[in-house]
Amino acid sequence: MTRTANEFLTPQAIKVEAVSGTSAKVILEPLERGFGHTLGNALRRILLSSLPGAAVVEVEIEGVEHEYSTLEGLQQDIVELLLNLKGLSIKLFDQNEAYLTLEKQGPGDITAADLRLPHNVEVVNPEHLIGTLSATGSLKMRLKVSQGRGYETSDSRFPEGETRPVGRLQLDASYSPIKRVSYTVENARVEQRTDLDKLVIDLETNGTVDPEEAIRKAATILQQQIAIFVDLQKDQTPVAQEPREEVDPILLRPVDDLELTVRSANCLKAENIYYIGDLVQRTEVELLKTPNLGKKSLTEIKDVLASKGLQLGMRLENWPPASLRMDDRFAYRSR
């Protein structure tokens, strides 16, 4: 008998086992036989190639004109210094590019903590080694950081025939926030059926994105790309469509998912802040006006948001989205 799409088993929940702050195992079961490899391979490729991230793309170093130069007092050569800069894990908030500066006098190590950052830039690995200076050495440089996806060569940023500016060292950029991802398919059982799959995805990020959020974004990309196949039998005449509201899925989650202390959570609900999207639009000043919410609670809220790549005072143009109707808010309030 032919089985329809609705008769296939589908996973009821996703299980995330944290290995460390940047590593996790994501388990999905039960799946029909063969779907473990189908979904695992697709998600793995998207995780490695299609998630947005930030990377250093251009460097200006005082006294250096090209990457084959040397700098007196710097233990590393310029090529090694540039390779170390590629190891920076950077997050950009509400912008596509930013400039970072560094001025360091020896002796001692140069780390990411020595960088001077704009308010909307965060380096999540401040201990990362950039270089080492002798007692007579000094380093002054300016970094350009850009947002992108996948891998971009420095040549692709310049039209053919265009001369590169002297003194601005160009870097190939690996924007992906995923350092490593692999998957395995194991046997699963539901009642009397033993011919099912269990998909286990093992991934490690660079710290700029939570592993669970990375899986969610990859699945969203996959869903958007294959959605058109669902409507193959319908009229294919193109029609003008209104732009869809694009909202990060994490903003639609209730504030309870942040696992704040009871005091902080109750203070937010008293101010009708039920979703993370409601919370991130509030400023520190506004929250401090909330009864019983002090600086300790504010610090807790800021730290939890920062761990998910969010911050207070964000501007959300499409909030609340149409999918979050008023009756949904009332239903949540009545819990």
Curated annotation (Swiss-Prot):
Origin superkingdom: Bacteria
Native organism: Acinetobacter baumannii (strain ATCC 17978 / DSM 105126 / CIP 53.77 / LMG 1025 / NCDC KC755 / 5377)
Alpha N-terminal domain (alpha-NTD) as annotated region, ranges: 26-233
Name of the protein described by the UniProt record: DNA-directed RNA polymerase subunit alpha
E.C. number: 2.7.7.6
Catalytic activity: RNA(n) + a ribonucleoside 5'-triphosphate = RNA(n+1) + diphosphate
Comment field on protein domains: The N-terminal domain is essential for RNAP assembly and basal transcription, whereas the C-terminal domain is involved in interaction with transcriptional regulators and with upstream promoter elements.
Quaternary assembly: Homodimer. The RNAP catalytic core consists of 2 alpha, 1 beta, 1 beta' and 1 omega subunit. When a sigma factor is associated with the core the holoenzyme is formed, which can initiate transcription.
SMART domains listed in its UniProt record: RPOLD
InterPro entries attached to this UniProt entry: DNA-dir_RNA_pol_insert (IPR011262), DNA-dir_RNA_pol_RpoA/D/Rpb3 (IPR011263), DNA-dir_RpoA (IPR011773), RBP11-like (IPR036603), RNAP_asu_C (IPR011260), RNApol_insert_sf (IPR036643)
One BP term from GO: DNA-templated transcription
Keyword Cytoplasm: no
Function statement: DNA-dependent RNA polymerase catalyzes the transcription of DNA into RNA using the four ribonucleoside triphosphates as substrates.
Gene Ontology molecular function, alphabetical: DNA binding; DNA-directed RNA polymerase activity; protein dimerization activity
Entry's Gene Ontology cellular component terms: cytoplasm; DNA-directed RNA polymerase complex
NCBIfam families, A to Z: PRK05182.1-2, PRK05182.2-5, rpoA
